[in-house]
């Protein structure tokens, strides 16, 4: 039960952080390119790499993993998890799996956004 509270706390922090960064980038660069999303994905990927590496070289408590890895980064972006998993595939020599992971994530996610939009727009 404790870990659930850590996930919830991290999630609320990550969601607020994402919102504030997105607003900041929108004000700074306008809406011609999704710089806010790019920024949170890049930051989230960096933080995921940091947390993963810290867990490899030292003891990271389950509470910290829940707070930062699942909660904060989960709310900030799931792209960090995707990036970490892809890098692990590459580092293990599974280049073909890494390629398919990249291709499937990009293609399927873009398609699902399209599908979701079409579902909504077709009902309006």
From Swiss-Prot:
Any one GO molecular-function label of the UniProt entry: metal ion binding
Keyword Transmembrane helix part of the UniProt annotation: yes
Compartmental location: Cell inner membrane
Pfam families found in the cross-reference section: CRCB
Keyword Transmembrane: yes
Main location per the UniProt record: membrane
GO CC term, one of those recorded: plasma membrane
Purpose of the protein: Fluoride-specific ion channel. Important for reducing fluoride concentration in the cell, thus reducing its toxicity.
Family as reported in the entry's similarity comment: Belongs to the fluoride channel Fluc/FEX (TC 1.A.43) family.
Protein name per UniProt: Fluoride-specific ion channel FluC
């Amino acid at each position: 039960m404790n870990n659930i509270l850590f996930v919830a706390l991290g999630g609320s922090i990550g969601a607020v952080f994402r919102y504030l960064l997105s607003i900041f980038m929108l004000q700074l660069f306008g809406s011609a390119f999704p710089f806010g999303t790019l920024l949170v994905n890049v930051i989230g990927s960096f933080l995921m790499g940091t947390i993963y590496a810290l867990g490899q070289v030292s003891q990271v408590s389950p509470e910290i993993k829940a707070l930062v890895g699942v909660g904060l980064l989960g709310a900030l972006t799931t792209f960090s998890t995707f990036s970490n998993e892809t890098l692990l595939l590459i580092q293990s020599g599974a280049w073909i799996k890494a390629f398919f992971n990249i291709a499937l994530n990009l293609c399927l996610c873009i398609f699902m956004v399209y599908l979701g939009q079409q579902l909504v727009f077709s009902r309006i």
